[in-house]
Swiss-Prot record:
It comes from Clostridium acetobutylicum (strain ATCC 824 / DSM 792 / JCM 1419 / IAM 19013 / LMG 5710 / NBRC 13948 / NRRL B-527 / VKM B-1787 / 2291 / W). NAD(+) binds at G420, F421, W422, G423, G424, N425. This is Aldehyde-alcohol dehydrogenase. It comes from the Bacteria. Induction: Induced during switch to solvent production.
Length: 862
């Protein structure tokens, strides 16, 4: 079927599409056999095709076109023979990723007059390798040779089992038919002039185009001159210069200019005389672009066209010019063995000239430099950086270099050279089979790796302090910096530690000015003292403020260059955070000795710090801040005030509940959280009433607090903590009370099976928070027949516990004035949404929902 009209093109396209549909079901083995035999056929016909191309177009050299045809068959086959292009091409079981290659459909292949047969071979082979059909639109001046090449490949492919009509062509090409083909095919491979490529991109279908070349090459004074000149002549004379990547201008440094010029003449170049330049200019450039009559002609022929007598053996014509402007014909792409030569005062001047020439024409295409790769590395790097070209060659003939797999074997062989966004293309490399494939990615569900990280050593038991601290001697520690506040200091706890340190022959310094909250100003002051003392051990003694302070002091002591603002940057996933905490432990270790049963900070990576300038509280979190050693000695908790016992105990309860229902909860944290909850409900009331005398209750609460800390350190906390931190910061309420005021309302909010918003990436398969709250109720034996009943019983149990501990019922009862509450409501609601803890909550809240919960907690009646 001949194609000479739109109707015939439609009919042929339909036939090719049917063939491609069959071809798309072929296996990799079948495709590879077809690919191999088609390449063999191209190689067998290389001389016949080369002769046909030169005879028809009058361009280039038969001998070089033979090489190009051979290259298009052999090198393309060798490069891609083992590449997977059919079906599953990649399978990663651990990551649950499968990649599947599918053909695009029918490729519209636009063929240039300069390289008709080799380009046809290339595009046919990469289309067959990818199970695509291909429909050629030859250049009118190269239609016979293009069709001959296409038919050669088609016959071999069909003989090897490919569907008939998998390759087609336009017999009488025209602009109308070419444009129509580009509109109807699935993708266009456009190799040709700027107007044709622009038309392909405007067709309404995907297109891979090329761009014009205008390759500048610098010869540096460090270059091997003979190699540089020989390489440029090799490239420039290849097929009479029709390769778009061939050198168009050579820029030579002044210090070696005459040597280079002499070498060119020695190698057969003709240096155009000054009085001959205008004659050549008139011949090589017509109507603002290269004269088609010189394309692919020999240097001798072009000289004759200009009326200049040169030896028949002349290899290239060189015009010594100075202008870099658009008006200078030598400054443009010439597609023939005609070369411009510029003299540069120095390398900087050469670089400027090269940049100007690329901007004049050839953006994105190719550039080159000849320089010593060792001695002139800085110049090569500067050239590479300055050139807006996707191919920059060093000591390589650019025609051969751009073709690929020659002189550098990581450049893929190709006859369609993408020029990137600089050149108006979407491809910034040599085009190959991968550009003719749809890659489907099948992603199977995988869960993120979880972890369980706690201090290296956790010592516990009533009276264990003196035995645990003996480890410091074994670790050869010599200087300890104690961080505490006035309460434990006055209670002689510090004296107890000092006696142990003195017995161990460890020098010490005490900082006892930590306030009710860990604040940045105090921390920085303490860090200065710490830096002067230069300890190898930091001992945190106290509760959350002391632990938080010591953790941040540790960071600032070991890394004074860090900024608090960076440490406070929030993250969605602790493993993917933008700011990475520095490694700790090179200067000192951190020993955390808790004197209260509350947050469990002695085993967590958390630090709650207040910025004195803004009054805002920040929850810092990073496992680098996890203490190296934790000591949980209930003897240090016997004298805790009743109020602190109540607030810190409820804090531990909320930690446990939120860790158990967190989106990061795991089998490793669940057991700790549940047992901590049981212990708290059982022993907190007794510790509150008779804590100074009930050793068992104190010790059980100490265990519960630390277990809750371990659970929350690895499962993280939730919305109750987000809201409590902001409420505490704004209205000066202790964080334990703030958590107590909010927890019941948060449980009600979370306890739904159809939340308005789910957490972004939970570990659970579906919302099951009601079930999890019910399991807590079951674990502490509250009864109830349904999960909903059990949730209500849990809320009631918490309410009863708070009542027994004399904790306020509402925010209002906690002393917050109504006017102050409502004036801050919008702000703290928004801040709570953005808090670090919110992301781990099982139900993701809206700001309006947070606001509503705050209001409910403010108005709540006893």
């Amino acid at each position: 079927m001949k194609v000479t009209t739109v109707k015939e093109l439609d009919e042929k396209l339909k036939v090719i599409k049917e063939a491609q549909k069959k071809f798309s079901c072929y296996s990799q083995e079948m495709v590879d056999e077809i690919f191999r035999n088609a390449a063999m056929a191209a190689i067998d016909a290389r001389i016949e095709l080369a002769k046909a191309a030169v005879l028809e177009t009058g361009m280039g050299l038969v001998e070089d076109k033979v090489i190009k045809n051979h290259f298009a068959g052999e090198y393309i086959y060798n490069k891609y023979k083992d590449e997977k292009t059919c079906g599953i091409i990649e399978r990663n079981e651990p990551y649950g990723i499968t990649k599947i290659a599918e053909p695009i459909g029918v490729v519209a292949a636009i063929i240039p007059v300069t390289n008709p047969t080799s380009t046809t071979i290339f595009k046919s082979l990469i289309s067959l390798k990818t199970r695509n059909g291909i429909f050629f639109s030859p250049h009118p001046r190269a239609k016979k040779s293009t069709i001959l090449a296409a038919k050669t490949i088609l016959d071999a492919a069909v003989k090897s089992g490919a569907p008939e009509n998998i390759i087609g062509w336009i017999d009488e090409p025209s602009i109308e038919l070419t444009q129509y083909l580009m509109q109807k095919a699935d993708i266009t491979l456009a190799t040709g002039g700027p107007s044709l490529v622009k038309s392909a991109y405007s067709s309404g279908k995907p297109a891979i185009g090329v761009g014009p070349g205008n390759t500048p090459v610098i010869i540096d004074e460090s270059a091997h001159i003979k190699m540089a000149v020989s390489s440029i002549i090799l490239s420039k004379t290849y097929d009479n210069g029709v390769i778009c990547a061939s050198e168009q201008s050579v820029i030579v440094l002044k210090s070696i200019y005459n040597k280079v010029k002499d070498e060119f003449q020695e190698r057969g170049a003709y240096i155009i005389k000054k009085n001959e330049l205008d004659k050549v200019r008139e011949v090589i450039f017509k109507d603002g672009s290269v004269n088609p009559k010189i394309v692919g002609q020999s240097a001798y022929t072009i000289a004759a066209m200009a009326g200049i007598k040169v030896p028949k053996t002349t290899r290239i014509l060189i015009g010594e010019v100075t202008s870099l402007g658009e008006e200078e014909p030598f400054a443009h792409e010439k597609l023939s063995p005609v070369l411009a030569m510029y003299e540069a005062d120095n390398f900087d001047d050469a670089l400027k000239k090269a940049v100007t020439l690329i901007n004049l024409g050839g953006l994105g295409h190719t550039s080159g430099i000849y320089a010593d790769e060792i001695k002139a590395r800085d110049k090569i790097d500067r050239f590479s950086s300055a050139m807006k070209t996707v191919r920059t060659f060093v000591n390589i003939p650019t025609s051969q270099g751009a073709s690929g797999d020659l002189y550098n074997f990581r450049i893929p062989p190709s006859f369609t050279l993408g020029c990137g966004f600089w050149g108006g293309n979407s491809v910034s490399e040599n085009v190959g089979p991968k550009h003719l494939l749809n890659i489907k990615t099948v992603a199977e569900r995988r869960e993120n790796m979880l972890w369980f990280r706690v201090p290296h050593k956790v010592y516990f038991k009533f009276g264990c302090l003196q035995f645990a601290l003996k480890d410091l001697k074994d670790l050869k520690k010599k200087r300890a910096f104690i961080v505490t506040d006035s309460d434990p200091y006055n209670l002689n706890y510090v004296d107890s530690i000092i006696k142990i340190l003195e017995h161990l022959d460890i020098d010490f310094k005490v900082f006892n000015k930590v306030g009710r909250e860990a604040d940045l100003k105090t921390i920085k002051k303490a860090t200065e003292e710490m830096s002067s003392f230069m300890p190898d051990t930091i001992i945190a003694l106290g509760g959350t403020p002391e632990m938080s302070s010591a953790k941040l002091m540790w960071v600032l002591y070991e890394h004074p260059e860090v900024k608090f603002e960076d440490l406070a940057i929030k993250f969605m996933d602790i493993r993917k955070r933008i700011y990475t905490f520095p490694k700790l432990g090179k200067k000192a270790m951190l020993v955390a000795i808790t004197t209260s049963a509350g947050s469990g900070s002695e085993v967590t990576p958390f630090a709650l710090v207040t910025d004195n300038n803004t009054g805002n509280k920040y929850m810092l979190a990073d496992y680098e801040m996890t203490p190296n050693m934790a000591i949980v000695d209930a003897e240090l908790m016997m004298k805790m005030p009743k109020g602190l016992t109540a607030y810190s105990g409820i804090d531990a309860l909320v930690n446990s509940i939120e860790a158990y229902t967190s989106v990061y909860a795991s089998e490793y944290t669940n057991g700790l959280a549940l047992e901590a909850i049981r212990l708290i409900f059982k022993y907190l009331p007794e510790a509150y009433k008779n804590g100074r005398t009930n050793e068992k209750a104190r010790e059980k609460m100490a265990h519960a607090s630390t277990m809750a800390g371990m659970a929350s350190a690895n499962a993280f906390l939730g919305l109750c903590h987000s809201m409590a931190i902001k409420l505490s910061s704004e209205h000066n309420i202790p964080s334990g009370i703030a958590n107590a005021l909010l927890i019941e309302e948060v449980i009600k909010f979370n306890a739904v099976d159809n939340p308005v918003k789910q957490a972004p990436c939970p570990q659970y398969k579906y919302p099951n928070t009601i079930f999890r709250y019910a399991r807590i109720a079951d674990y502490i034996k509250l009864g109830g027949n349904t999960d909903e009943e059990k949730v209500d019983l849990l809320i009631n149990k918490i309410h009863e516990l708070k009542k027994a501990l004399n904790i306020p019922t509402s925010i209002k009862d906690a002393g917050v004035l109504e006017e102050n509450f409502y004036s801050s409501l919008d702000r703290i609601s928004e801040l709570a949404l953005d808090d670090q803890c919110t992301g781990a909550n099982p139900r993701f809240p809206l700001t309006s929902e947070i606001k509503e919960m705050y209001i409910n907690c403010f108005k709540k009646q006893p």
